[in-house]
Amino acid sequence: MPLVVVCGLPSSGKSRRTEELRRALTGEGRSVYVVDDASVLGAQDSTVYGDSAGEKALRAALRAAVERRLSRQDVVILDSMNYIKGFRYELYCLARAVRTPLCLVYCIRPGWPSRGLPVPGACESSDPAVSVSWRPRADYGEKTQAVGAVEQRAISPLANGGVPTAVPKELDPKDILPSNPPAVMTPESEKSAEPAPCAFPPELLESLALRFEAPDSRNRWDRPLFTVVGLEEPLPLAEIRSALFENRAPPPHQSTQSQPLASGSFLHQLDQATSQVLTAVMEAQKSAVPGDLLTLPGTTEHLRFTRPLTLAELSRLRRQFISYTKMHPNNENLPQLANMFLQYLNQSLH
């Protein structure tokens, strides 16, 4: 059955969307398997994305887990960032080899950096009630500028040459400006939501955002593409069902189709048949003149004789024919190996 690839930056709602889709499909009586980072990482944490070797091993483990589960009977959901388009192409080839459909669900959090095509609603300010494990540096800059403006207004009369007003002996505590900038206030929802032990460090989040390769529906391995912005936007379940269960699977091609199995004696018979043709050609050309059609025993094809052929030239063409035939073995061609070799000689000799 189909493969669903969930894509997006950390804390963009991928796991929640995965669980929502899993419940919807299991409610219809379908078998659904979820492959995520937690089932592969084990005791490691999310900092594995900061190590190129560890991240490469993680992608290999995710690909192997998907390949084990992928079949024509079960739905497999891959819940991971999947931010490298080359890795998404590998998943596309896996689905194509099994002849099962594939779709991509791209989760975007409003206000987070996006390097792909512009998505409506993705540049809106994020909801402060939703807790995150990091805070953009711009938030601190705006608050620091606001504090500096208050201090500048407090000393502006003195800076413009004005006369300071008399200060009463007893000042109201509310009128006294603090010497240090006020601390950034955190909403109660953010105070109560503690980051998970495997929270992504800010530097790692910035690095992931920079090297994130957003999916593009113009690429065949990224379509059909369903983009979901935020957690309030409903998941297009009807469109996803149509893409998974009503669309035709991509047709296999040579890179994803298994080669036909050859018998154990195929190479031996190939070597024997071409060797016999080579010996017969060398013998027949002794009494032939240019323009004759050489008839060889055990073949129905004819070889047009145009000039004397050397054994070295025929041996080179024989090696080329054997190398090509070994790449495409087929037991059905065993009786026609000699005729195929003669056809190859007619096309190669000038």
From Swiss-Prot:
InterPro entries in the record, alphabetically?
Answer: KTI12/PSTK, P-loop_NTPase
Q: According to the UniProt entry, which residues carry Phosphoserine?
A: S156
Q: Which residues bind ATP?
A: G8, L9, P10, S11, S12, G13, K14, S15
> Which SUPFAM superfamilies does the protein's record reference?
P-loop containing nucleoside triphosphate hydrolases
What keywords are assigned to this protein?
Answer: Acetylation, ATP-binding, Nucleotide-binding, Phosphoprotein
Q: Does the keyword ATP-binding apply?
A: yes
Residues modified as N6-acetyllysine are K143
Q: Example GO molecular function term?
A: ATP binding
Name one matching Pfam family.
KTI12
Protein origin, superkingdom: Eukaryota
Annotated region (Disordered), positions in chain = 161-196
GO biological process per UniProt: tRNA wobble uridine modification
Query: What family does this chain come from, according to its entry?
Result: Belongs to the KTI12 family.
Q: Which PANTHER family match?
A: PTHR12435
State the protein's name: Protein KTI12 homolog
Q: Which organism is it from?
A: Rattus norvegicus
- Gene name, please? Kti12
